A protein has these predicted regions:
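A short, structured loop/turn motif at beta-sheet edges
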Residues: 48-52, 71-79, 110-116
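A short, polar/proline- and glycine-enriched secondary-structure boundary/capping micro-motif
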Residues: 42, 64-71, 129-132
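Residue-level detector of beta-strand structural context in well-folded domains
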Residues: 44-46, 68, 106
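Sec-dependent signal peptide recognition
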Residues: 2-8
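A short-motif feature that recognizes glycine-rich, charge-decorated loops
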Residues: 57-90
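Post-signal-peptide N-terminal segment of Sec-exported extracytoplasmic proteins
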Residues: 38-63
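Short, well-ordered, aromatic-rich surface patches in folded extracellular/luminal domains
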Residues: 5, 16-38, 87-150
């Protein structure tokens, strides 16, 4: 009986690991979530994947509401990778805030090799993260997106 449980678990483990290899190109390089505030903050989610696809979901106070997709150029993709490579994952904080009560929350998820870093951005953000944020907004404006039906 124990042997059959072991075989089932081993089969599940191997099937999951083979699926992981097949989807490596769809893994996310960077995701950026812009949350709401008391004012008119833009609310959206942007993901840039290793297969160079961009997923955009506009939720509130943005020009494009709904889910969209496009492809990023090799140059822009390399620029994002370069900016991420400048971030010291071991020494960067996970939360940047201040004493202000109505701050616009942004969530930045960075992925590099086998490292992931989730950072909550409110205020007092270091320069290298501001550069990434600036590049994200540039990419949103730069590309034409295809609307995805729900």
């Amino acid at each position: 009986m124990r042997l059959s449980y072991f075989l089932i678990l081993a089969t599940l483990f191997l099937s999951c690991s083979s699926n992981r290899n097949n989807t490596s190109n769809n893994q996310v390089l960077i995701s950026y979530e812009s949350g709401s505030c008391y004012g008119k903050c833009e609310v959206f989610i942007l993901r840039i994947n290793y297969n160079k696809s961009i997923e955009y979901e506009g939720l509130k106070n943005v020009e494009k509401i709904g889910k969209y997709t496009t492809k990023i150029s090799v140059n822009d993709f390399n620029e994002i990778e370069k900016l991420i490579s400048k971030v010291d994952f071991n020494n960067i904080e996970s939360v940047y805030t201040s004493k202000s009560t109505d701050l616009h929350l942004r969530i930045l998820n960075l992925h590099r090799k086998n490292q992931n870093k989730k950072i909550l951005l409110f205020d007092n953000i270091p320069f290298e993260l501001k550069q990434i944020e600036k590049e994200v907004y540039s990419i949103i404006e730069k590309y034409k997106y295809k609307f995805l039906k729900n």
